Amino acid sequence: MEIAMVCTRVSLLILILSLCSPYKFIQSPMDFGPLNLLPTTTTASSDFGRILFQSPSAVLKPQSSRDISLLLGFLSGSSLSKVTVAARGAGHSIHGQAQALDGIVVEMCSLPSEIEFYKGGEGEISYADVSGGVMWIELLEQSLKLGLAPRSWTDYLYLTVGGTLSNAGISGQTFKHGPQISNVLQLEVITGRGEIVACSPSKDADLFNAVLGGLGQFGIITRARILLQEAPQKVKWVRAFYDDFGTFTKDQELLVSMPDLVDYVEGFIVLNEQSLHSSSVAFPANVDFSPDFGTKSSPKIYYCIEFAVHDYQHKNTNVEQVVEVISRQMSHMVSQLYSVEVSYFDFLNRVRMEEMSLRSLGMWEVHHPWLNMFVPKAGISSFRDLLMDNISPDNFDGLILIYPLLRDKWDTNTSVVLPNSGSMDRVMYVVGILRSANPDDGCSHHCLQELLRRHRHIADTAGARIGAKQYLAHHPTPSGWHQHFGRRWEQFAERKTRFDPLLILGPGQGIFPRSNNAAYGS
Ligand code: FAD
């Protein structure tokens, strides 16, 4: 044991020297004692965005939390080293957030995929203990076997638990249960100092809160305890169309005010034929709606609300009746309400069906210049106008999601940044501009740069004018990050000093660039 530790330390020293050397010599798998450190791969330097490709010098495929602790413990103990480390979940970031230029990428999916359940009795909670590299789809598949499921989701499930908890994790259930970070009971985290810490709201709460929505800056999540609830067997899934933005948002706000009846609320802008039939693979209703989209100079756009009601077969709830009660209060376009009943699994896994369809058309592995923003309720109309001034509906490829969230479902002690709540509105919105740019369809370098420039303009203008904040944020400069955090910057930076003083973690976010051997704040 002792000998193994000494070997590991010596090997790590060689590693650090090799990474700091101008002549990188990691070309083949290296024996770093028990650490499975490998030469870089193309996967480690790419992500879903396909915009940035930063190559690390090595990849760690950890077999246990201890492997990560050894690596970080050694790097944080050596002021010699400038080596940075990024945890990589499923790599579904847009702007290289899980990349580490010339550093080490820790591939979280190499951790043994452990999922353990505790099923509470009547009146007790149920939960699952899962490794940080487990994907939500795996947790769903396993938990359904026990009739259970997490309460809060993302739209797409091929994302890791550690990856979404480092951001927030939102979807149509967020209005009811809060984001995924509001549904975690406990974490195991390896800090930037290499310490393995079990933390929760009552133990090492500051680390717990820092890591949730912490953009991978304070520690690597190796385990999480996720709250579960009874899973419905089926879901009644409804879509209703609107031709007026004010009516659309008013109805969305009505729906989120009825959490006893409604289980999911989202919505999207119908810009063109393609968005009208968005995710029609998963939503197999016969949509008999042929709107007039106007002309290029005078486009007409529409809106679609999606809501869902869970169907628990043993409860004998009449979901048809529940939908009827809800929809009677809505003001959608006449006859433009469609519904389908699908299994709970298919409902949650709906984006995977779209993925398979897009893959078969060669349209999945393209550039994704996405922009997500949290918008205060008071500014949602101006945000819509800003958006429409900066996109052309006739050639927009992708989806624009808009749906309301409720502030009081978010814990403001976590690291997540929301718009200031000056007006005390309980409602805020999330808007996701989920755009594809296909080089084979004429959108290569120049076109992509132009789309990114426009998104930056939207983000900057909406930030300055209406106090909107980016979700899954990307800021090219540290000063952009200072502005993003606003008055929360000091707390974020202080937590960094405490949990990752040598600025080793999360270099791809660009929040704390590592300058010459300085610890943050020194
Ligand atoms: P990665 O991209 O691998 O990592 C993201 C960040 O987290 C990086 O900074 C990384 O260093 C850090 N990180 C990763 N693992 C850990 C860990 N174990 N511990 C500490 N830090 C870690 N998001 C939503 O909220 N709602 C949605 O509905 C939604 N839908 C999406 C649909 C698609 C098709 C895609 C591509 C993305 C979607 N996202 C959504 C965004 C997604 O939640 C984030 O991009 C998330 O980071 C992806 O998880 P990942 O496992 O791929 O993380």
Please place each PLM-identified region on the residue numbering.
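Noncatalytic alpha-helical scaffold of FAD-dependent oxidoreductases
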Residues: 1-522
